[in-house]
Regions:
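Non-transmembrane, amphipathic alpha-helical segments
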Residues: 23, 27-30, 34, 42-49, ...
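Secondary-structure edge/capping motif, primarily at the C-terminal ends of alpha-helices
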Residues: 42-49, 68, 107-110, 131-139, ...
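A cross-kingdom marker for long, charged
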Residues: 166-234
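Extended amphipathic alpha-helical interaction segments
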Residues: 88-173
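Immediate post-signal-peptide N-terminus of mature secreted/exported proteins
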Residues: 1-4, 16-23, 109, 204, ...
């Protein structure tokens, strides 16, 4: 979400997942993925200073956490603290970050790796979805950051594959295959980092990964991520 703000795009409330839909998710699979999706919308709202909306999305995350048996983490005190800090963005960022770090830790401690993996997948899907809603007006920096998500997707697929297979994890890996195919149009070449000393004595680091892509690839990424996102966010 910070990346989206720095890239200069405008907040788009219409792109967010509908709050009212949360009551319809009764399976662990849908609750887990949509918790990640709503968490992505929560972060997006916080970063763009949509204060009231941020608290509403936090409340929605609380409902899904109740269904997953971890409702004590996003409790009334946390909601109240977020509400009291709604006009202090940095405080809200800290509250959201700490909360989802604790949630992920609880899932892992309780052997709920499936939930942890689906939560991570949902959050990543929503982040890319939000970043690709306005490709025509996107900055070059945002387009580059979207293309670089190929590396994050590779890591996500590896994470999902590291858990004991379940039908829900298999469903997610299958759903992400078209997204993987779209990202195949991105090539990333690792170049060794080189340090050079400038005239004023500062050290300049050059090199690092070189990312290549074209507009057709970004369009394919945008279309494929929308399909998988809307498959779960019904």
């Amino acid at each position: 979400a910070m990346l989206l703000e720095r890239s200069g795009i405008q907040f788009d409330a219409d792109a967010l997942h509908t709050l009212e839909n949360a009551v319809g998710y009764s399976t662990t699979e849908l609750q887990s993925v949509n918790l990640g999706i709503y968490a992505g919308d929560l972060s997006y709202s916080v970063i763009f200073n949509q204060n009231q909306q941020s608290v509403e999305y936090l409340n929605t995350c609380r409902r899904l956490c109740d269904g997953l048996g971890v409702g004590d983490i996003i409790n009334a005190d946390l909601i109240s603290r977020a509400d009291n800090n709604r006009d202090v963005r940095d405080s809200l960022v800290d509250i959201v970050t700490d909360t989802f770090y604790e949630l992920n830790g609880r899932f892992r401690e309780n052997g709920m790796e499936e939930v942890s993996g689906l939560l991570a997948a949902g959050g990543w899907i929503e982040g890319v979805y939000l970043g690709t809603r306005s490709l025509n007006s996107s900055t070059a920096d945002l387009k580059l950051r979207i293309a670089e998500q190929k590396m994050t997707l590779d890591n996500l697929i590896g994470l999902l594959g590291s858990y004991a297979p379940t039908p829900a994890l298999t469903n997610m890996k299958e759903a992400l295959r078209p997204v993987e195919a779209a990202f195949a149009g991105v090539t990333i070449t690792e170049n060794p980092a080189v340090s050079t000393a400038a005239v004023d004595g500062t050290v300049v680091i050059s090199g690092g990964p070189e990312v290549n892509y074209d507009e057709a690839t970004l369009t394919a990424i945008s279309e494929s991520i929308a399909v998988v996102r809307n498959q779960y966010a019904q």
